[in-house]
C-alpha cells in the first residue's frame, strides 16, 4: 500500500473540528458499576489533528511513561497509550474514522465512532459504550475526552 492509496480522495467541507487540538483531560466511565477513573493518570498528554484533506491523527499517552528495559515493561507500554490514524467523515454530532494504522492491530480496518461538540475553543468528545482493549476486564466503558484548540 502506498501513501497515496490511503490519502482521502477529496477535501472535507470546512468544519469546526479542523485543526490541531491539545488534550486537556481523559476519563472513563464504567457502565456496570458507575465508576469513573483516569486510566492514563491525572495529566496525560495527547493531540488530535483533523486535516482539510479528511485525515485524522489521534495520540494519547499516559502520565509518567518511562522507557522499557524488559519485554514485560514493553508489553505494559501498549496499555498506556492510544494512537490511530485514518480518513474521517462527520455525520451530525459524530466523527467516524476509518482506521488504517493503530497502536492496536485489532482497530486497523475498523470504523471508530466518536460523539463530539465544540464549545468555544474546546472539543468535548465521548465514545459509544464498548469494551476497550486497554482494560477489557472493566466491561463496557465510555471515554470522555476534552481538548483545547492549539
What do these predicted regions represent?
Residues 2-83, 90-150:
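Lipid interaction determinants
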Amino acid at each position: 500500500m502506498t501513501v497515496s492509496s490511503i490519502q482521502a480522495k477529496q477535501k472535507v467541507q470546512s468544519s469546526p473540528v479542523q485543526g490541531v487540538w491539545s488534550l486537556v483531560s481523559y476519563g472513563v466511565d464504567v457502565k456496570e458499576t458507575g465508576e469513573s477513573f483516569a486510566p492514563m493518570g491525572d495529566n496525560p498528554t495527547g493531540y488530535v489533528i483533523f486535516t482539510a484533506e479528511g485525515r485524522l491523527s489521534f495520540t494519547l499517552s499516559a502520565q509518567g511513561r518511562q522507557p522499557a528495559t524488559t519485554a514485560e515493561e514493553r508489553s505494559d507500554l501498549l496499555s498506556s497509550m492510544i494512537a490511530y490514524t485514518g480518513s474521517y467523515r462527520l455525520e451530525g454530532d459524530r466523527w467516524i474514522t476509518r482506521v488504517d494504522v493503530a497502536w492496536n492491530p485489532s482497530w486497523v480496518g475498523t470504523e471508530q465512532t466518536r460523539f463530539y461538540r465544540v464549545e468555544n475553543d474546546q472539543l468535548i468528545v465521548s465514545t459509544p459504550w464498548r469494551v476497550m482493549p486497554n482494560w477489557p476486564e472493566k466491561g463496557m466503558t465510555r471515554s470522555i475526552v476534552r481538548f483545547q484548540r492549539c
